[in-house]
């Protein structure tokens, strides 16, 4: 492609709204432009990267026997009503009526469509298992869009779906798809980890997220440096300390005026926050008031709490609700209370005496011991994991990392197929629900993550596997000699099967070299008057900065050798 006739342009400075380095480079390099909030247009250079990522995906999915298919992006609302997700998705779902007043929606995901397709297409166990995939558009009316391609309203995903007769079959294909996804990320040059995750509205078993390491990531990851344990902080657990069997004096009351926070209490009593018990109150539709107790230096993890309580949603309790169970806000504890659901974190069990509220304004209790002085309805891991906590697998100190979600896989089971009546006849002629799996990778997100992990102060440093072009050919000067040599090289390299970005613009050497560094092709070939006098050109590797001089008649061979070594 000749830059003189290409669509799009580079920018010297990034627009002010671009805060992340990768977002800035996407705009400066002319890969994409924002047309509306949450809607980005990919320009030709960005589209070439997009297609190369797609090609890797097609190859790896074909290698595990997946068949490509395609569903509509507009779904009937009635389909989603049957699974309960029409109401569950809330305002993130874009809903509308057609001219016949049929309720429709722009698909935020495609599980319902696949289950309905299976209902219509699959009759017998002989048609299973089956693995399908598509690379297709989705729309989610996100409350906030951010970070360029990271959180869009309209975006593209690789979605794969498995259909099996039983859970054993699902387990097998789940592992195959997981390996294919990992190969895709590796081929794209992404540093990532697979982590345990929350299933959210998708449901199912063993949800796993693929997280790309990034200091600007919006997700917090808990990773063990010694073993394979890794989890999203939303669901991460920690190893439990050995129980403290020391004899603790009897519980006693102490005056603590104006100590309504853990920090104020710890300062007043000259103890650490870890020696206190924190009371946090939530309300749920299913179980009413939930009294949560964690160690004073810990924070409640609402996702883990919802799971422990067996409720779908939580909201902060009101002062009236707290008072109704006999607790006093700011001085609360479960001591002496009954007829209330109490959920305690492991951090307040088996740790000796703690300071807790006395349920009386201005007073706390010392030497409060779980099991002796109070009981919980449920004891569970409901606090956030912190740096240095023990790994639940090997006991090593856990570390916290930042990451960007680039993929996820779920064992959906029969949630969608049962709701939509997608069954098959087993060998005995009995109808059984089809067992589903769902697997996804966000393409725009993956594109930006590649840039996030592969750039320097000058610009993008593309991995060869996904670079828009194999080579950036730079013509210095506009003399007939230079133009003829550059054009001949462009033709020879293209005929040799190399993709070439040819900078034939009437610009200075400085502008061209800066743009070459910004655009980040793996190789830069420079043709100029000085070199041609000696029948040589300059070849520079973007990643290493290594420069070599090559004879004109050896250019194609030399570049092919470099590509082979890479």
Swiss-Prot record:
User: Domain notes, please?
Assistant: Consists of three domains: the N-terminal catalytic domain, the editing domain and the C-terminal anticodon-binding domain.
Record flagged with keyword Protein biosynthesis? yes
Q: Which reaction does it catalyse?
A: tRNA(Pro) + L-proline + ATP = L-prolyl-tRNA(Pro) + AMP + diphosphate
Cited function = Catalyzes the attachment of proline to tRNA(Pro) in a two-step reaction: proline is first activated by ATP to form Pro-AMP and then transferred to the acceptor end of tRNA(Pro). As ProRS can inadvertently accommodate and process non-cognate amino acids such as alanine and cysteine, to avoid such errors it has two additional distinct editing activities against alanine. One activity is designated as 'pretransfer' editing and involves the tRNA(Pro)-independent hydrolysis of activated Ala-AMP.
- Give the similarity note: Belongs to the class-II aminoacyl-tRNA synthetase family. ProS type 1 subfamily.
Task: Please give the coiled-coil regions recorded for this protein.
Answer: none
Q: Cite the record's note on assembly.
A: Homodimer.
Cited InterPro entries:
aa-tRNA-synt_IIb, aa-tRNA-synth_II, aa-tRNA-synth_II/BPL/LPL, Anticodon-bd, Anticodon-bd_dom_sf, Pro-tRNA-ligase_IIa, Pro-tRNA-synth_IIa_bac-type, Pro-tRNA-Synthase_IIa_type1
Record-linked PROSITE patterns: AA_TRNA_LIGASE_II
Molecular function GO labels:
aminoacyl-tRNA deacylase activity; ATP binding; proline-tRNA ligase activity
What's one GO-annotated cellular component? Answer: cytosol
Query: GO terms for biological process?
Result: prolyl-tRNA aminoacylation
Q: Provide the protein's localization.
A: Cytoplasm
Q: What is its EC number?
A: 6.1.1.15
Q: Which SUPFAM superfamilies match?
A: Class II aaRS ABD-related (SSF52954), Class II aaRS and biotin synthetases (SSF55681), YbaK/ProRS associated domain (SSF55826)
Keywords, sorted A to Z: Aminoacyl-tRNA synthetase, ATP-binding, Cytoplasm, Ligase, Nucleotide-binding, Protein biosynthesis
Disulfide-linked positions: none
Enzyme class, spelled out: ligase
Q: Give the protein's recorded name.
A: Proline--tRNA ligase
Q: Which Pfam families match?
A: HGTP_anticodon, tRNA-synt_2b, tRNA_edit
